Each structure stands twice: as C-alpha cells, then as structure tokens.
Amino acid sequence: MNYHRDEDYLKNESMFKNIFQKRFNLIKSHSRSGISTVLDVGCSNGVFLDLFSGSETWGVEPSKIADRAERKGHMVLNTFFEQAKLPENYFDLVIMNHVLEHMDNSAVVLTKAYKLLKPNAILFVDVPNIGGLGSRILGKHWPYLLPKEHKHQFTKGSLTKLLEENGFKVLHWESRSGIFEFANPIRELGRKRFLLDLFAIPYSLTATLLGMGDSMSFVAKKI
C-alpha cells in the first residue's frame, strides 16, 4: 500500500478498518489486562479508535480531519503530539500507526509516549520497512520512501534498538505486504485495487513469509 493521507481515509474507510482490525487483534493478543484507556497519535478521522468500543479513546491529530474523530465521541487534541498536553501514567495503550517516520526526533517522541503510559502498558508502532523486499527491489522507486515526508526510515534492528533505548521491551514483531495486511481479504473483493493485490500475491506471500514486507508492526511494553 502507498502512504495514506486524510482523503484516503475518507474514501477508503472500510478498507482501513479491515487493515486496522488485524492490528487491533494483534494488540489485544498482547494486552492481557485489558485496555481501558487508549491514545492514537495521528488518529485522522478516528477509524482505528472506532475499534476500541468500551474504552476511553483519545487522539492527537494536527489536521482539520480531527473534527470528524471528535464528532464520533473520541477525545481529540487538534495539535502536534510534541505540543499536546496529555495525562502521564494514564494510558494502557499508545498507538503510532505510520507516524514515527514523520517525526523530527523519534527518541523525543518515544520518551513522551513512555511517560504517558502506565507501568507495563503497551506501545504499538507500525512503520514502513526499509529492510523489506520491496525496498530492495525498487530502490528509489519504493512507494514508501517519500523523502519529503518521511524524515526517518527503519529496519527491524534499528527500531528495536531505538525502542529499547527509550525504556521499552519488544514483545512481538511482524512484517506484511499486500493482502496480508487485511484481517479479512475477502471483504476487499469489490475494490478495484484488490485485483492488483491478487496479481501481487506471489510477491506479497514471499515478502510476508520472509519477514520482509513493506510495513512492520512492533508491540512493545513499558518497562
């Protein structure tokens, strides 16, 4: 998938729900004590937060689309994460879904996330995988490169090291591409882009099985 913007969320909300459902399931499998409070950094229109029914949902979103998330009942701060005034030692989960690569100082951002989380709480990070198969094959044409927008690129090793240096223990890591991003690929059958995803299955399957997909997820615990 290419890098997504606010208009992409609005036009393809059901597709993103399918993607986020898989990430939600992954988070839940590592949150044995439950999630009563969740913060989504870069929450857009709140489509990821929508999955956390019964939880107190917070978001940080600097763009105007924050209004849509707020209208859904999420508590949203319309500012940048670095400037956001948020309660410390409060959240069971902080989500950074394709956000960390945009930040000026990744270490500062992770330090702030650490302070916001309760002891032993969970940080979920999803970022492009520059160590993946797509990046190696396509080089400067890799769609996730976006040098004007992505200030950082990460490999499994580099982000694991960064998380550990900022007080986190990685509980789980995985990498995926194509239809393997979806919780239920069958739901995408009516979408035009899904035909391209089907043709790309040999690549997507190989990349996913090798742990060299275009995106990667980290579930980390505050220690």
Regions found by a protein language model. Give the residues of each.
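Basic phosphate/pyrophosphate-binding loop/patch that engages nucleotide-derived ligands
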Residues: K115
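Conserved N-terminal segment of class I S-adenosyl-L-methionine
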Residues: M1-N97, S106-T111, S175-R176, N184-L189, ...
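S-adenosyl-L-methionine-dependent methyltransferase catalytic module, highlighting the catalytic core
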Residues: M96, D104-K112, I122-I223
